[in-house]
């Protein structure tokens, strides 16, 4: 990703010269990563895997990689956060990141990334933090369009044994919220200005449609709601945001 310094808009770039021949997964180089960066980069990898899985352009190989990545993250991220020198947890998180990368490189991502890119470009919000906060919010906003695949993930990873897709999907999203909570990841993002949201939503919508095979297409109006749902509101902003019922 690159950021246009004039427009503060992020763009994806790619070229065969940028594609590595090898990926070296050496856990020791991650031992010094601070807990909060461990948490948010780990949730970023989780976002890669989940968005690759629930999109409408998947293949058996990418689904398999995504599921393995999700399971590894569920099993190891908290340990890596608690103890940065846990070699086993660090090794499994590196593998999870790699697998999630192979999955989304072929099957793409979704609205979580589209919104996160706009926030990073405009405000410099760290990408992993933006994804961490947005992931459960947008998965919930997808509603029934994502229930079947989220429910399948919930059952495959042992999060739910419910036969009802809506219930299993809800338990999966709740598990993600609890992961964020356990690693002190906030529920909102500071600095989002009301006057910027329509422009940011247009950027995100243009990125998601037609670039990403998202579970459901929203349009700018629906996308705007995602910014309000994660917008940190202080006392000066509260009255201005009262017109947006999706934001407390």
Regions found by a protein language model. Name each.
Residues 1-107, 194:
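Carboxylate- and glycine-rich phosphate/diphosphate-binding segment that chelates Mg2+/Mn2+
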Residues 150, 160-248:
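C-terminal charged capping/lid subdomain of soluble metabolic enzymes
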Residues 53-59, 107-109, 141-148, 234-238:
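Short helix-capping/linker segments at secondary-structure and domain boundaries
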Residues 107-171, 177:
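C-terminal catalytic subdomain
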Residues 64-68, 72, 92-95, 114-117, ...:
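Amphipathic alpha-helical interaction segments
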Residues 43, 47, 67-70, 74, ...:
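Hydrophobic faces of stable alpha-helices that mediate helix-helix packing
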Residues 33-35, 57-62, 136-138, 161-162, ...:
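A ubiquitous short alpha-helical element
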């Amino acid at each position: 990703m690159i950021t246009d310094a004039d427009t503060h808009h992020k763009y994806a770039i790619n070229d065969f010269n940028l594609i590595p021949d090898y990926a070296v997964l050496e856990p020791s180089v991650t031992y010094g990563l601070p807990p909060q960066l461990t948490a948010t980069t780990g949730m970023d990898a989780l976002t890669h895997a989940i968005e690759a899985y629930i999109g409408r352009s998947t293949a058996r190989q990418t689904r398999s990689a995504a599921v393995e990545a999700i399971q590894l993250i569920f099993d190891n991220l908290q340990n890596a956060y608690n103890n940065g020198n846990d070699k086993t947890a660090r090794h499994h998180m590196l593998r999870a990141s790699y697998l999630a990368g192979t999955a989304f490189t072929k099957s793409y991502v979704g609205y979580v990334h589209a919104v996160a890119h706009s926030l990073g470009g405009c405000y410099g919000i760290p990408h992993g933090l933006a994804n961490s906060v947005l992931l459960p919010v947008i998965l919930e906003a997808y509603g029934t369009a994502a229930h079947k695949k989220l429910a399948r993930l919930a059952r495959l990873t042992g999060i739910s044994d419910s036969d009802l897709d809506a219930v299993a999907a809800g338990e999966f999203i709740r598990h993600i919220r609890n992961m964020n909570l356990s690693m002190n990841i906030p529920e909102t993002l500071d600095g989002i200005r009301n006057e910027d949201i329509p422009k940011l939503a247009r950027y995100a919508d243009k990125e998601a449609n037609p670039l990403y095979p998202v579970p459901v297409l929203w349009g700018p109006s629906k996308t705007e709601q995602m910014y309000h749902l994660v917008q940190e509101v202080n006392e000066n902003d509260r009255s201005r945001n009262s017109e947006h019922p999706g934001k407390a």
